[in-house]
Amino acid sequence: MLEEQNSDIERKQDHIEINLKQNVNSTLKSGLASIKFIHNALPEINYDNIDTTTTFLGKYMKAPILISSMTGGTTRAKDINYRLAQAAQKSGIAMGLGSMRILLTKPDTIKTFTVRHVAPDIPLLANIGAVQLNYGVTPKECQYLIDTIKADALILHLNVLHELTQPEGNRNWENLLPKIKEVINYLSVPVIIKEVGYGLSKQVAKKLIKVGVKVLDIAGSGGTSWSQVEAYRAKNSMQNRIASSFINWGITTLDSLKMLREVSKDITLIASGGLQSGIDGAKAIRMGANIFGLAGQLLKAADIAESLVSEEIQLIIEQLKITMLCTGSCTLKDLAKAEIML
């Protein structure tokens, strides 16, 4: 058991180090570059009246932005999460934590996930891999994760390709949907289903909605490729070649977003995967997202200082607001109907 716990910590340390130092982006792009807004040269709007506010999980947000789940479980992760949470609170946006599975076997890692004291008002998301439900994790333990960090929702992430490209990954994905349904019915907060960089299809979305999922995080191809991360972690040529061969795998963020919005007009959609700016975020909202998530550039900033994270978030918000003014959009509802090139 101790060896397994140490392996979990080493893996998390590897993931942070590789993401910070290597180019692990998918060779696919998010697809959002193909969306072209029609510029409005006479918007008839006062910039100071532009409203980027929204609600998520019953909480007010100053902007429709989620700091996507990244890390936890290590000393370095503790500092990163703390800085991200401080910046999220200051900016009035949401934050997801990295996978918390390690907390179930190594309780002393709680301090690396505990951020509610510095971010009392934000939508805060707990997180664990859905496949862990096939390896003994129970709905009660999922509730424990929520209670421990005072989360507003639980992310169950679907990371099948990532698991299959790491030597210690989980292989059994059989009969997982009924277990997801059990968790949904048991928990005191909503369940968010999130991919990790390969997108959600229409068929998968329909299954998840049928069992009661109300929020989906697309996490499409275009950003971090976790198979490429594992290629850097590989201990031998075979592992490296297997992982590297999937660098261009997945459904792009734009394709996934369009498919899922066709499935349901009511479900809350988070667009993430390769978004780099507030302009990308505006495009995602125009194409059907309720909020948008970013990770990579915020991770790099958070490894240095909270002030850099806050600066990056303010840049993204400013880009969003300028895009709104230049499309004649005073609110996010207006932005969702802004004119685009067809």
From Swiss-Prot:
One GO MF term attached to the UniProt entry: isopentenyl-diphosphate delta-isomerase activity
Organism expressing this protein natively: Rickettsia typhi (strain ATCC VR-144 / Wilmington)
Family as reported in the entry's similarity comment: Belongs to the IPP isomerase type 2 family.
Residues that bind substrate: R11, K12, S99, M100, R101
Chief location category: cytoplasm
Keyword list, A-Z: Cytoplasm, Flavoprotein, FMN, Isomerase, Isoprene biosynthesis, Magnesium, Metal-binding, NADP
Signal peptide start-end: none
EC number: 5.3.3.2
Subunit annotation: Homooctamer. Dimer of tetramers.
A biological process from GO: isoprenoid biosynthetic process
Gene3D superfamilies: Aldolase class I (3.20.20.70)
Cofactors named for this entry: FMN; NADPH; Mg(2+)
Enzyme class at the top of the EC tree: isomerase
A GO cellular-component term linked to this record: cytoplasm
Protein name as annotated: Isopentenyl-diphosphate delta-isomerase
Role summary: Involved in the biosynthesis of isoprenoids. Catalyzes the 1,3-allylic rearrangement of the homoallylic substrate isopentenyl (IPP) to its allylic isomer, dimethylallyl diphosphate (DMAPP).
Residues engaged in binding Mg(2+): E163
